[in-house]
């Protein structure tokens, strides 16, 4: 088994992709295509990873409990698109699934995330290694910053400027995810917000 890592990181910063001489990008989503206009519903599947060594069978998707949820693709964190949605209820999530068969520690997950002024700020990260039957918490809580908020020292997300310090969340030490046929990560809201409030992810 090779000593490689799942590094889902900012695709612009080379240092974030290679954590060691033997590190490898297993699967990454740079959001090269937009969500079809006027897409609504409780479930949405963006599709397979466009970067990495093991993209076959991967998937980026989302689930919301409100059927009126709109899925869209505004500008990302230095990339053309991101995956965004509104109508957030506690328990709603973005999800990535992949296989780490043939990969050993260190396993690391990284992604960019922001929100609108009324979008959810409180999230947790869950992981399953048995196809989604059981989930464990791998990041208990973190706060999502509103891009461009006065005093935050940030600008709104756009296709040119990447702001990894403020908007990138990294989860490392995921030993249980190594060498698994099925690994699922959920980026899950722990709060319910106004229907119009949005949250978006990029560079997973």
Predicted regions mapped to residue ranges:
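Surface-exposed, low-complexity/disordered Ser/Thr/Gly/Pro/Asn-rich loops and linkers
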Residues: 53-105
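Extracellular carbohydrate-recognition regions
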Residues: 23-57
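Conserved Ser/Thr-centered positions that define the repeating blades of beta-propeller domains
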Residues: 126-129
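Terminal, low-complexity interaction segments
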Residues: 26-36, 117-118, 135-204
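Short glycine-centered, acidic/aromatic-flanked micro-motifs in structured strand/loop junctions
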Residues: 98, 113, 187-189
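Extended, low-complexity, turn-rich repeat/linker tracts enriched in Gly/Pro/Ser/Thr and Asp/Glu
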Residues: 102-105, 114-122, 194
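Structural beta-strand segments of beta-rich domains
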Residues: 107-109
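Short, threonine-centered small-residue motifs that mark membrane-proximal processing/anchoring sites
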Residues: 2-25, 204
């Amino acid at each position: 088994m090779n000593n490689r890592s799942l590094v889902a990181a900012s695709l612009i910063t080379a240092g974030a992709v290679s954590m060691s001489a033997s590190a490898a990008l297993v699967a990454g989503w740079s959001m090269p295509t937009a969500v079809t206009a006027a897409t609504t519903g409780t479930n949405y599947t963006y599709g397979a990873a466009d970067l990495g060594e093991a993209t076959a069978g991967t998937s980026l998707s989302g689930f919301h409990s409100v059927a009126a949820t709109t899925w869209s693709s505004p500008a990302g964190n230095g990339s053309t698109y991101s995956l965004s949605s509104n109508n957030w209820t506690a328990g709603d999530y973005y999800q990535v699934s992949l296989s780490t068969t043939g990969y050993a520690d260190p396993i690391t997950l990284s992604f960019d995330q922001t929100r609108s002024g009324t979008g959810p700020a409180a999230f947790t990260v869950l992981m399953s290694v048995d196809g989604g039957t059981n989930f464990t918490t791998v990041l208990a809580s973190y706060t999502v910053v509103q891009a461009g908020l006065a005093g935050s020292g940030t600008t709104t997300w756009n296709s040119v400027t990447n702001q990894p310090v403020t908007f990138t969340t990294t989860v490392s030490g995921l030993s249980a995810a190594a060498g698994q046929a099925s690994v699922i990560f959920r980026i899950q809201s722990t709060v319910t917000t106004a229907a119009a409030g949005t949250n978006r992810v990029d560079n997973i």
